[in-house]
Design a protein with these regions (language model features):
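Conserved catalytic motifs of ABC-family nucleotide-binding domains
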Residues: 164
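ABC ATPase nucleotide-binding domains
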Residues: 243-267
Length: 267
């Protein structure tokens, strides 16, 4: 079953300077997201990854083409309807927010009862489960502004899980996490995907994270689809060397059999 679809999507920022000879941040992008899959979006800087997130969040709308979730155009949804379907975990959560962790995570429940002013026992239970799953339950009464970057990242993920979306969009989810929490984050995402059937879109510069976690990958370059396929099909030495402009080698992880990308560093 298809959860979301991009169909011939172009996007250009108004009055923006042309990038690399063309004004489009995305051009002719088409792909489907299947229910329950983990889908990675890769590409160098200025490839269009952030624009894709902004389109899914409806911060901006396509210049041409359509984006649908559950067969409904994003432009036809109310904000509450959109938030019940899609949750976005940004790369950076603003510092200095005047909320406790519990209060911020409970905000993920607002789309389910936009006219309700008080949390129900069910809301509290869902929020507690989300905090426990992300390892921030012991920080529930702490102010978000005093947390470390890694802790704020896990709180943002907890809020998204409390939203109970059909589609979870993650922008560099391990960017502020140490090695231990990177491993735990990947394990959590796999568990959410497996137990809840949540479709996950992972936007990342980390080719190896995407290769280890994702069922399919979309590689963008200059706003266009360079390749769409399995990690084995997309993480190709010749293709990556061309797109990223540096020599790489691709081997197999001895434990998982998944492709691993290594850069030929110069001394």
């Amino acid at each position: 079953m298809t959860v979301a679809r991009f169909d011939g999507v172009d996007f250009s920022y108004p009055l923006a300077e042309p990038r690399r000879g063309h004004p489009f941040a995305l051009r002719g992008v088409s792909f489907d997201l299947a229910e329950g899959e983990v889908f990675g979006v890769l590409g160098p800087n200025s490839a269009g990854k952030t624009t894709l997130i902004r389109l899914l969040s409806r911060i901006v709308s396509p210049t041409r083409g359509t984006i649908e979730v559950d067969g409904v155009a994003l432009t036809a949804m109310t904000r509450a309807e959109l938030a019940r379907r899609i949750a976005v975990v940004p790369q950076d959560m603003p510092q200095g927010l005047p909320f406790t962790v519990r209060e911020l995570v409970l905000m993920g429940r607002y789309p389910h009862a936009p006219r309700r002013f008080f949390e129900t026992p069910d809301d509290l239970a869902v929020a507690r489960e989300a905090m426990a799953a992300t390892g921030v339950l012991d920080l529930a009464d702490a102010r978000v502004g005093v947390l470390s970057g890694g802790e704020r990242q896990r709180v943002a993920l907890a809020r998204a899980l409390a939203q109970e979306p059909r589609l979870l969009v993650l922008d560099e989810p391990t960017a502020h996490l140490d090695l231990r929490y990177q491993v735990e984050c990947v394990a959590l995402l796999r568990r959410v995907n497996r137990e809840r059937g949540t479709t996950i879109v992972l936007v990342s510069h980390d080719l190896n994270l995407a290769g280890a976690l994702c069922d399919r990958l979309l590689l963008l370059a200059d706003g266009r689809v360079a390749r769409l396929g399995t990690p084995e099909e997309v993480l190709d030495e010749t293709l990556l060397t061309t797109i990223y402009g540096c020599a790489v080698s691709v081997e197999r992880n001895a434990l998982t059999g998944r492709p691993v990308v290594q850069v030929a560093w110069r001394r």
